[in-house]
Amino acid sequence: MNPTQKPEPVYDMVILGASGFTGKYVVREALKFLQTPSSSPLKSLALAGRNPTRLTQSLEWAARPNPPPSSVAILTADTSDPDSLRRLCTQTKLILNCVGPFRIHGDPVVSACADSGCDYLDISGEPEFMERMEANYHDRAEETGSLIVSACGFDSIPAELGLLFNAKQWVSPSVPNQIEAYLSLESDKKIAGNFGTYESAVLGVANAEKLKELRRSRPRRPRPTICGPPAKGPTLENQKTIGLWALKLPSADAVVVRRTLTTLTEKPHGLPGINESPEQIQKREAFWSSIKPAHFGVKITSKSLFGIFRYVTLGVSLGLLSKFSFGRWLLLKFPSVFSLGWFQKKGPSEEEVESATFKMWFIGRGYSEESLASQGETKPDLEIITRISGPEIGYITTPITLVQCGLIVLGQRESLVKGGVYTPGIVFGSTDIQQRLEDNGISFELISKIKTQG
């Protein structure tokens, strides 16, 4: 072999952080597709992390009730050891990164992938991290052919695909003005979120100013052309169409969707693949030509005002205490207190996870004819409601979306962009990702399409 030639990867996929609370669920999901069916692109799998014993225990847990597959390798890697990450990248085609908070642990992994040409997916929901990775590593990843995509978990696959699914319903001459997502979390049992998710939220609020500084330092990008100005909706509303109270949510989803729409403005036909067939090019261009951009926002919902009060309490606690070190110490020391029981260090039980579900409603408002949008004070006269439903968000839906994105990267790499740092919507939107999710328990529905009084 030429000494300058990149060695052939030993593994198709490595799950980094496989012994973590989310990581073990990702392992369980990946095992479903390891050499099954025979056409699966996942032929070889390895688990990576700091502690081989814990990785082995994670594999045993994920394989239950079957014995753990002997073909799954256990590799040692540490985000604080760049050499171990570089070695990891030479051994695999794709890394699924489950090690958070990503603003602390993610940069070295992305750097190693961008330098080596290894593909990378993660489950980050941290806007500052994601935009910093784009700023720091996009050019290098383009050069080496490393495809780097964050937010491939519940943040932000449902929001991205939900927006695209709703946008596709606006058949010409109709155009959307605004699409709002309403997230409803349901469970038969009281379920506590994982501490890692909570820690990421605390650090995200604490570093909000750094995100503003990063954006100010970056070149201005073109904004999508949207028919009509954004509607000025209330912060709190009684959403009678779906029978829920709703509160505006400053989420990563809205940030990721806006980045996707910005990229689409720059590349109206999507991202050209490495070696697409004429049929694949036609399919991609037709898909993106059908997507009309809209103002987008996310709201969290509850059946009662008391539930909304709990969200407000959590938001106020994060906003007030995350800004200084002692406040962050309090938030991270006593997560159950400041989140009113929503987050705890030990995470939910398997029974609690199995009992939970989500619904994400997408209420689109726009115009039955594009010409109406330019008529001054004319209000939207068309409403389209779609919905995505699925299992628990953090430990069932997130592994499903991450693994399916990974399988697309492994099985359809020639039809994807060569390299760069991108959002999941622009990379996977025109693939068969929606059908894959539907095949794995996440449904997409058109609920209604009605004319309203403008």
Curated annotation (Swiss-Prot):
The question of whether Acetylation is a record keyword is answered with yes
PTM-bearing positions, type N-acetylmethionine: M1
Q: Which GO terms describe its molecular function?
A: oxidoreductase activity
Q: Which organism is it from?
A: Arabidopsis thaliana
* Acetylation as UniProt keyword: yes
An annotated GO cellular component of this protein is:
mitochondrial membrane
Question: What is this protein's name?
Answer: Probable mitochondrial saccharopine dehydrogenase-like oxidoreductase At5g39410
Alphabetical UniProt keywords: Acetylation, Membrane, Mitochondrion, Oxidoreductase
E.C. designation(s)? 1.-.-.-
Provide the primary localization: mitochondrion
